[in-house]
Amino acid sequence: MSLPCCGRVRYLLLALLLHGLGEGSALLHPDSRSHPRSLEKSAWRAFKESQCHHMLKHLHNGARITVQMPPSIEGHWVSTGCEVRSGPEFITRSYRFYHNNTFKAYQFYYGGNRCTNPTYTLVIRGKIRLRQASWIIRGGTEADYQLHNVQIISHSEAVAEKLSQLVNRTCPGFVPGNSPWEQDVSYNLWREENGCECTRALNFAMHELQLIRVEKQYLHHNLDHLVEELFLGDIHTDATQRMYYRPSSYQPPLQNAKNHDHSCIACRIIYRSDEHHPPILPPKADLTIGLHGEWVSQRCEVRPEVLFLTRHFIFHDNNNTWEGHYYHYSDPICKHPTFTIYAKGRYSRGVHSSKVMGGTEFVFKVNHMKVTPMDIATASLLNVFNGNECGAEGSWQVGVQQDVTHTNGCVALGIRLPHTEYEIFKMEQNARGSYLLYNGQRPSDGSSPDRPEKRATSYQMPLVQCASSAPRPEESAEENKIGRYSSRAPKKDSSVFMLTLMLFICTGSHWNIHS
C-alpha cells in the first residue's frame, strides 16, 4: 500500500515536471499527457536515459582526471586483471621503473582467459628515456628504450619443450638438442653484451614503452584514495608486425601498486609475484553474453589514427537491433567535440568463439547512419566533398544532424553503407557489481573487420552498463541526444534526474498494487 504523503508528493512532482520543465522536457510525450501510467512509464524511461547521460557527461567534463606532463613513472605498476592480447595471448604485467631510468618488467603468460594457469614468464631489463610530448597522440609522451636482457622461464615441462622447439625454428641450434629447456629454469633470449637475440619466435617487442601517459584521479572524490594509472602504447593486432609498429593508442592501464583501487584483488596478487611465483588470479566463471540494455564508455577512449571518442550502445534483444552513438573529440579528455555518428542496424545471435576462450562471436550490420559536425573545421571538411558522397553537397552546418543513409554513408569519414562487421564480445562484472562489456579491438592498420578472418582476437576498453533494458527503437529519439552528450548540454539535466528519481521512489508501491 502506498503512503498518503507519497501519493501527494507524487502528484506534486508530476505538476512540477509538467509546469517547470516545459515542452523541452524528455518526460513530455504526445501520448503521455492523459494517463498516469503513461506518465510513470515516461518518467522511468527518462530516469534510465539520465543515468546514461550523467555517466557520459561526467566524462565530457573531464572526469576529474589529472594528466601528469611530463609523466613520473618511477615506481611499481601492475595489471588490474587478466589482459587479452591479439593472438590471443592471456597476460598479466608487473613493471618497475627506477630512479636511474632502468626498468625491470615481468610479463606473465597463461593458458586460459582467467589467468589461473601460468605457462611461462618473460623478465625484461633495460633503460628508458622520456622525450618530448607526442606530436601525434595528444596527451602522450614519447620515449626511447634500450633492452639489456630478456629471460624466459617455463612453468611446466610441456611448455618448456614446446618453447625450445619454437625458438629453434627461428634461431637454429639456439637450444642444444641434447640439453632441452627445463621447467622453472631461466634462459636468456636476449643479452646485450654478446649479441644474443632470439625473441622473434615469440613475436616479442617492448615498443609499448615508446608511448606513455600517466593519469591521476581521486576515486569517489575521496582525497585519501588516489589512483594512479600508467598507459603504455598499444600492441599491433597482427603479432608478426609488433616489432615494426610504433604505438598510436594505448593498452589497458597499469595501476600504481602504491596508489591503486583498493577493490583490485588482482593488483595485490600481481604485486607480490615474480618469475618463480607467477600470479594466479582467482577463478571466475564466464558470464553468458546478453546483448540488451544500454552501455557507455568509462573513460575518454583513444583509437589508432589519432581518434578520441566516447561510445553509447543500445541493444534491443527482443528483435536483435542495435543503436550506436559515437562522440568524437579533438582532445584526450573528450571536452572539445568534432563530430558525432549515430548508427543503427541488426545483429546476429551469439556463438561461442572457438578461437578466443571466453569470447562470443556476433555479426553486426549497419544500414542507417546520421552525422553531426560539431565544429567549423569538420563542417568545412564535409562541405568540400562533391556530389552525393556524404549527405547533401555543401549543406553541412555545425550542430545540425544529417542522414547519410541515402548517400551510402560518408566518404569523408571513411564509412560505406550498408556495412557488415564480424565482432567478438565478452562480459565481466567488476568489484562493485557493475557489468562490463568488451567488444573486439579495432585492427591496427585502420581497416575494418569486414570478413570472418579479420574478426578480432583481443578487446577494446570496456563499456559499463548504465541501463539494464533499452527503450523501444521508436522511443530512443537519437536526434535529441546530440546536444545532451556534447559540451553544449542543457543545464536542466540534474533537476530532471532528481525529480524523476523521487517520482520513481514514490510510485514504487503504487505500481505494486496494480501488478
From Swiss-Prot:
Extracellular side: 27-495
Residues passing through the membrane, by range: 496-513
UniProt subcellular location: Cell membrane
GO biological process, one term: Wnt signaling pathway
Signal peptide bounds: 1-26
SMART domains: APCDDC
Annotated tissue distribution: Expressed in both the mesenchyme and the ectoderm of the carapacial ridge.
Chief subcellular location: membrane
Glycan-modified residues: 100, 168, 319
Record Pfam families: APCDDC
Cellular component aspect of the GO annotation: extracellular space; plasma membrane
Region described as Disordered: 437-486
Membrane disposition: Single-pass type I membrane protein
Bias (Basic and acidic residues) ranges: 472-482
GO MF entries: Wnt-protein binding
Spans within the Cytoplasmic topological domain: 514-515
Keywords linked to the UniProt accession: Cell membrane, Glycoprotein, Membrane, Signal, Transmembrane, Wnt signaling pathway
Family recorded in the similarity comment: Belongs to the APCDD1 family.
Entry function: Negative regulator of the Wnt signaling pathway. Inhibits Wnt signaling in a cell-autonomous manner and functions upstream of beta-catenin.
Name recorded for this polypeptide: Protein APCDD1
Lineage: Eukaryota, Metazoa, Chordata, Craniata, Vertebrata
